[in-house]
Design a protein with these regions (language model features):
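Walker A (P-loop) phosphate-binding loop of P-loop NTPases
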Residues: 61
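Short beta-strand-centered segment that lines the nucleotide-binding/catalytic pocket of NTP-utilizing
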Residues: 77-92
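Hydrophobic anchor at the beta1->P-loop junction of P-loop NTPases
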Residues: 54-56
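Short phosphate-coordinating micro-motif centered on Lys-Gly-acidic
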Residues: 27, 73, 111-113, 119-173
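N-terminal pre-Walker A segment at the start of P-loop NTPase domains
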Residues: 26-40
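Conserved lysine of the Walker
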Residues: 64
Length: 173
């Protein structure tokens, strides 16, 4: 179990798609350290499939790269994971499937995303983890949405909201 201050809840939310309604799962996890945030990433990694896209949402310094370090560890990545702020994408190929870690902070639209070869990365059968997803949201339909929020009262506390369907409903935390 992650930390004594961990809490989780599941909420059913209705999503309209093609005039059919589907139930999706939403889970919130509270962590009290970067290590706990990484541990949640490791748990998520165990459920990932080739071609999955993770769309991160959260302010600067919220813990998106820390979460990705855990994700990478859970995929068996042996390289050091760093923020792709200046490179736009970092590739990690040593795990059970490739991990492509994108930072879209400097991009203005999905058009920019396609200019850097987005479709080529998708075709490679790995996991795409996308920071600053709000900048390219229209290209990320069907993505697993992970929102990381800082607690204004405690700089170490994060609330991680995972929206990705039933596959992520039981993380064993």
């Amino acid at each position: 179990m992650i930390g004594r201050k961990l809490f989780c809840f599941f909420a059913a939310c209705m999503v309209e798609s093609c005039q059919k309604s589907k139930v999706c799962e939403k889970m919130q996890i509270r962590t009290i350290s970067p290590e706990e945030t990484e541990a949640v990433g490791r748990k998520i990694a165990a459920k990932l499939l080739p071609g999955d896209i993770i769309a991160y949402y959260g302010d600067l310094g919220a813990g998106k790269t820390a979460f990705t370090r855990g994700l990478a560890a859970g995929l068996g990545v042996t390289e050091q994971v760093t923020s792709p702020t200046y490179t736009i994408v970092n590739e990690y190929l040593s795990g059970r499937m490739p991990l492509f870690h994108f930072d879209m902070y400097r991009l203005d639209s999905a058009d920019d995303l396609f200019d850097i070869g987005w479709e080529d990365y998708l075709a490679r059968g790995g996991v795409c983890a996308v920071e600053w997803s709000e900048n390219v949201e229209e290209a990320l339909s069907g993505a697993i949405r992970i929102t990381i929020s800082k607690d204004p009262a405690d700089e170490n506390v994060r609330t991680i909201t995972i929206e990705g369907g039933e596959r992520f409903a039981n993380l064993g935390l």
